[in-house]
Amino acid sequence: MAEPPSPVHCVAAAAPTATVSEKEPFGKLQLSSRDPPGSLSAKKVRTEEKKAPRRVNGEGGSGGNSRQLQPPAAPSPQSYGSPASWSFAPLSAAPSPSSSRSSFSFSAGTAVPSSASASLSQPVPRKLLVPPTLLHAQPHHLLLPAAAAAASANAKSRRPKEKREKERRRHGLGGAREAGGASREENGEVKPLPRDKIKDKIKERDKEKEREKKKHKVMNEIKKENGEVKILLKSGKEKPKTNIEDLQIKKVKKKKKKKHKENEKRKRPKMYSKSIQTICSGLLTDVEDQAAKGILNDNIKDYVGKNLDTKNYDSKIPENSEFPFVSLKEPRVQNNLKRLDTLEFKQLIHIEHQPNGGASVIHAYSNELSHLSPMEMERFAEEFVGLVFSENENSAAFYVMGIVHGAATYLPDFLDYFSFNFPNSPVKMEILGKKDIETTTMSNFHAQVKRTYSHGTYRAGPMRQISLVGAVDEEVGDYFPEFLDMLEESPFLKCTLPWGTLSSLKLQSRKDSDDGPIMWVRPGEQMIPVADMPKSPFKRKRTTNEIKNLQYLPRTSEPREMLFEDRTRAHADHIGQGFERQTTAAVGVLKAVHCGEWPDQPRITKDVICFHAEDFLEVVQRMQLDLHEPPLSQCVQWVDDAKLNQLRREGIRYARIQLYDNDIYFIPRNVVHQFKTVSAVCSLAWHIRLKLYHSEEDTSQNTATHETGTSSDSTSSVLGPHTDNMICAVSKASLDSVFSDKLHSKYELQQIKHEPIASVRIKEEPVNVNIPEKTTALNNMDGKNVKAKLDHVQFAEFKIDMDSKFENSNKDLKEELCPGNLSLVDTRQHSSAHSNQDKKDDDILC
């Protein structure tokens, strides 16, 4: 409630020319007689952020009626709590001692003193009184000089204090005083501040602090996951930045909520994302990287060839060497490049390291090799092929592919050659737009190709593969010895054919090859109009109703053209079946289809993606390869740029390669590759079982003589005649850590080798055979007494010394080797599991 008008106001106005007699204590307001307290309080309330709900003193028109004399009334208690003292310094008209000491004080709860009531009888001039509401708006010329000076001095003393209080409230410096009940004086009146608003401000500050803490925690967690550590400052200057950070936090949270569709299907976590980010960021030192890898040794295993000195290949990493990039997956090209220093023809070998994929490819160019003599060309071929197929200590090739550009120029056009020399040879060709296959002759297929050929592609179905070493069962093809002789004229192909000098097979005839060569023709990927497609399944008749409603039919209701995809999805070349299936190397020759057009430059025929051999298992897992399927159906998805980038982020290395006309290419084992035919091409390809891949199985052996007989099994002609009587011996083995992976891959049966039988025994008596020590990669066994009869095989006794690490594999092997009767499932695969460099030393009793 507002207090009643007090006669003190009239006392303050009674002395118009008074001077200030005393100074109030620090913090008190000095008022002139011309300035009623009601007007001052009204002015104060407007300037102070409107804290008080209502004014305590001088409300309404009390300032204007201050000159009216009213008897003092008992004041009501203040609405804001405890009473506070009022103090005035009235101005006197003359410097008399009574007027100089006329300052008085009284509390809000006491009556007016008698001395004050006596002074109330003095008349008040009307011209000196100004309405309180217009006092602050009066011009200075209307006031007396003394009053104007006093008002200006009073205003000057009041403004700095208001500014200080506003600054305290703004910066929060006066919060503690306000919360503790400290009051501010106004017009000589004690006016406490509202507590509920102070509490609200304190709560808002606490909430802001908690929000900042939460933001810091969230940002720190996000940056720790991203490998960044950044401390945010809490100063007031960075408040506008917090809005941007809030948006970033929301974006990151939204990205986390979104899951990749492929990850939702597989529900497999990323295995390499965090480790690759950490190491690729350069946070690990070179020493830590070596310890983490555990792969990089001082010596690098080199290819063992006839003309290569392996002693010169022991390249060690210098201790003070600095590598600009350290990664768990990246190969250090410096080590591989040092291997070229000891090569005879290193200036003719070009190594391409692809920065996007991280894998390396070896190139050689026939125009640079033209000055070599035939003997030098043979040495270069062995050196180049040995470098392409060389492997590290993990049996993974250093390079994903080796290419000799233009090396097949001496060969004739394959399609022209076979259509002219073997016109009636049957072939199988596909029909464009259909999955049907029709059988035709080589000359008829060549005629279709020639009729539809234009600028690098033809519009006829592709020709399926035919065998060049004889057809078996449902295969198509024949034996073409003259063409095979032309292939052997190349030093690169002579050593890498299935029966070549680097092969572990010793074939009596080229017809016995189960690894090719094969030949096929592809038209190239293209868009084909529907009208040009024979018997197109997309073509349909329009009914009468459709003809009437043509205006409503969209133009895309019928396909105008169709994409013919000429692609071979990702696969790895394998030999063998079942548990004996294992990866092997591949060789290919490309001859573009020209049909009389001979361009000056070789045409691009294939786009190839090859993955590094060391990432074989990861590629199989990521791309869901079924390695027991044929090459065309091992993978169900096509690897495009987006998939390549995803795999690269997970540390998988690859190379993107373009193959040209007349190129010969070599692909090491465990290299997953996919091909896309970009122009019409005739291809040759075959598998090669290198001695390098089976060199650890070659040991010197003593043979036991057996009786020979004839065999009706045509598939075993590689090994020679077989009979029903066999004597099988299990060799004594020493453990080799290099082939421990074969134990886990169930390749135990590959170590049982089958050889031709020397003689046939007529007696049915058991024969005791003493077998010396031999080295394989399975386990330690002593074959002491082996009993054999004409129709079955019996093992008398075994003494097995097992290592605890290979106990399970030995048990499985014993069950497979000792069933009482030994059945040979695939003799061709067994023969391929070893090399026969010295036939006498390699004979095994089977």
From Swiss-Prot:
Name of this protein: Lysine-specific demethylase RSBN1L
Lineage of origin: Eukaryota, Metazoa, Chordata, Craniata, Vertebrata
Cofactor(s) listed: Fe(2+)
Sites bearing N-acetylalanine, chain numbering: A2
Cross-link (Glycyl lysine isopeptide (Lys-Gly) (interchain with G-Cter in SUMO2)): K223, K548, K753, K763, K814
An example Gene Ontology molecular-function term: dioxygenase activity
Record's cofactor remark: Binds 1 Fe(2+) ion per subunit.
Database matches in PANTHER family: LYSINE-SPECIFIC DEMETHYLASE RSBN1L (PTHR13354:SF9), ROUND SPERMATID BASIC PROTEIN 1 (PTHR13354)
